[in-house]
Design a protein with these regions (language model features):
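C-terminal cap of thioredoxin/glutaredoxin-like
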Residues: 58-141
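Structural alpha/beta surface segment adjacent to cysteine/selenocysteine redox centers
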Residues: 1-62, 132, 136-137, 141
């Protein structure tokens, strides 16, 4: 219906040693290989999170069709790191301290308002919160 937008933000937690490298790599795979490559990379990172290393992250990106030299350049680019840092700052403003976390509500520019949902939830729980947010948005028009 076009009424819902799903936005992924990075929140590499400091106690996960490879989290920042994984976030950088996933963001670079999206930039270099597109949306489908990003989702394949994200899935591979989650499936392998217990054994992530710089070498494995590079191999997984290669499996998504990303050239290792281009990946390394992207991951070393200050702009890539700044975008992840901005996501971390936004999470802090929203009170998000862990993953997975979701904000279901409305966004106007850089301002997001809504309900914070922390942790894995059932499809029913998400559906109810999304329907609630859609009703509130409709009523405020």
């Amino acid at each position: 219906s076009g009424k819902v937008r799903y936005v992924v933000k990075d929140l590499p937690l400091p106690f996960h040693g490879q989290a920042r490298g994984a976030a950088l790599a996933a963001r670079c795979v999206a930039e270099l290989g597109g949306r489908e490559a990003y989702w394949r990379m994200a899935d591979a990172l989650f499936l392998n999170q217990a054994k992530l290393s710089a070498e494995l992250i590079e191999r997984l990106a290669g499996e998504q069709g990303v050239d290792p030299a281009r990946l390394a350049a992207c991951m070393a680019d200050k702009k890539t790191a700044e975008r992840i840092d901005a996501d971390v700052q936004e999470a802090g403003r929203l009170g998000i301290t862990g993953t997975p976390s979701f904000v279901i509500g409305t966004a106007k520019g850089d301002i997001v308002t809504g309900t914070l949902v922390v942790g894995a939830q059932s499809e029913t729980a998400f559906s109810a919160r999304i329907e609630d947010a859609l009703k509130k948005a409709e009523a405020s028009r």
